[in-house]
Amino acid sequence: MAGSQIKIPLPKPPDSDSQRLNAFPVIMAQEGKGRLLRQIRLRKILSGDPSDQQITFVNTYGFIRATPETSEFISESSQQKVTPVVTACMLSFGAGPVLEDPQHMLKALDQTDIRVRKTASDKEQILFEINRIPNLFRHHQISADHLIQASSDKYVKSPAKLIAGVNYIYCVTFLSVTVCSASLKFRVARPLLAARSRLVRAVQMEVLLRVTCKKDSQMAKSMLSDPDGEGCIASVWFHLCNLCKGRNKLRSYDENYFASKCRKMNLTVSIGDMWGPTILVHAGGHIPTTAKPFFNSRGWVCHPIHQSSPSLAKTLWSSGCEIKAASAILQGSDYASLAKTDDIIYSKIKVDKDAANYKGVSWSPFRKSASMSNL
């Protein structure tokens, strides 16, 4: 059985926008009881290389409603029926070219027609049927997908509320647009993340998030209390990469060896909204050969939080957060080795103190640019 953990402390880097993911403010429409205003959230995350092409990630948040029933006769004065909200939902439109007009983006949402169905295989799934999307997003990933299948617990807040025999529609209310460098768009293939071998050691990453919530709120019961009294603390883990086991029997592969490897990689972590709330990791130094498949050619990798912790990701749909600290943990890769060895923790992961100073787009990070009624 593993013994105590070994920790290498480091003071926390300065605060910055790249550490935070702010929640959308709740703004009610003056007309229409209980009607939220549509809003757009804009942010830039750039690699620092002026030659790197810029793209936009568009992510949507909204609500699933039952499709309104149509009557036999409809007059000119008939009001559009709005059915009650069933549950909240998230759907990513994916990456595409840079979009220049925030107001146009909000108005274009009226042209969206996305149907929602529930199904199952080895677990519950949600099927999004893309009947129509705004022409503005024709070059984004969603335009190539007529059907999107996903795990229900990752994209729907309360999938248990969706029942058989009811037709559902997804209504977009919040639009999150991230202007980023094309080199940031990299995720590791799931089979590679899931593979375990006795020939390597696994490097995990723990990110501690300070989530904005009240101490007496329901979500606070599932998190740690913040010693600074500014919210609650949530821990989320990712499989970062693998390191080859050393074969030199005269060398000690301890925390000093691991710290040296991590220090040479020069790891930096930040947070953004790409495939939903997403942790971005950049290796700015030497990447060991065994670890290279886990990063792209420029040293970037993205880890959507919903892949590791769906419940935490759904909490962040409506709550802001910031990165409190990040650590890398060295473990045995196969379960037999994992059970017999201590975790070696490297706490010197830097939190990116600010976005790259590139002024290709004049949008300020997380500035609410425009809003309109959710009709």
From Swiss-Prot:
Domain of life assignment: Viruses
Pfam families cross-referenced by the UniProt entry: Matrix_Paramyxo_C, Matrix_Paramyxo_N
Single GO molecular function: structural constituent of virion
Any one cellular-component term (Gene Ontology): viral envelope
Keywords annotated in UniProt: Viral envelope protein, Viral matrix protein, Virion
GO biological process, one term: virion assembly
Location in or out of the cell: Virion
Coiled-coil residue windows: none
Protein purpose: The M protein has a crucial role in virus assembly and interacts with the RNP complex as well as with the viral membrane.
Family per similarity comment: Belongs to the morbillivirus/respirovirus/rubulavirus M protein family.
Protein name, UniProt field: Matrix protein
